[in-house]
């Protein structure tokens, strides 16, 4: 869709570190695809001799293909090996996080990445179980956690637990901070940055950054007390429409925020 609206001299520079993503590449001379994390945006633009960009779009979601493919281990459905790596060449995976992180580290990631108020109890239960047997499969982890949810709350609870682990495996919040920080230098005047988030941890970061130009609760100011935030909001946020939800029910948690470089 972006290519359809792009002029003949425009460039679309795309990043995706997933090995499977190359199957969807369109044959178009305006498209430059790099199979790597988007934190390499600044480095890649230097390589392409591009000084500034007019727009940045970051879609932070996991694709349906990744969720549905058992070998990727993103889904909490039984029979999946716990993996969750976006970049399958990296060493650390979900098994490593679950079985080697300390109880305190697990508690922190469940609380910060998943907003789970009983994060300490969840971490304690996992640490007790892994002493008996290494947790490798989704059905094993689900069994360990079954005392924390009812049949009614099962899906939402497990989704947040798995989300917390996935964020840690892929260092998603650290990478999000990096791409937002780079956008201040790379966007041209009146350039637009748009970010699609799928959970509150991501959304809080983006909302604060667009509001303050940094990740602090207050904007950085000059000696006269004027805000140094280089952005203004394009709009507050957008949620999927009813028609969009019918096409893709997994988009229900998506939230789009946009800001303009001033």
Residue ranges of predicted features:
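S-adenosyl-L-methionine-dependent methyltransferase catalytic core, i.e., the SAM/SAH-binding region
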Residues: 1-262
């Amino acid at each position: 869709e972006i290519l359809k609206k792009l002029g003949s001299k425009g460039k679309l520079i795309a990043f995706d570190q997933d090995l499977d993503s190359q199957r969807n590449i369109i044959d178009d001379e305006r498209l430059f695809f790099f199979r790597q994390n988007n934190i390499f945006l600044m480095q890649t633009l230097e390589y392409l001799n591009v000084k500034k960009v007019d727009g940045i779009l970051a879609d932070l979601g996991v694709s349906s293909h990744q969720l549905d493919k058992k070998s990727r281990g993103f889904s909490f459905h039984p029979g999946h090996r716990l993996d969750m790596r976006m970049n399958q060449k990296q060493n650390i995976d979900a098994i490593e996080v679950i079985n080697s992180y300390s109880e305190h580290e697990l508690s922190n990631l469940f609380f910060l990445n998943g907003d789970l108020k009983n994060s300490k109890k969840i971490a304690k239960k996992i640490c007790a179980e892994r002493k008996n047997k290494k947790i490798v499969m989704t059905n094993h982890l689900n069994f360990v956690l079954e005392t924390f949810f009812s049949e009614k709350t099962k899906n939402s609870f497990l989704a947040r637990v798995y989300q917390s682990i996935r964020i840690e495996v892929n260092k998603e919040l650290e990478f999000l901070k990096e791409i937002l920080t780079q956008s201040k230098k790379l966007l041209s005047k009146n350039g637009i940055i748009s970010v699609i988030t799928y959970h509150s941890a991501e959304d809080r970061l983006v909302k604060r950054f667009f509001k303050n130009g940094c990740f602090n609760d207050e904007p950085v100011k000059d000696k006269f007390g004027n805000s140094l935030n280089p952005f203004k909001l394009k709009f507050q946020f957008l949620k999927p429409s009813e028609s969009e939800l019918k096409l893709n029910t997994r988009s229900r948690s998506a939230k789009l925020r946009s800001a303009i470089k001033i």
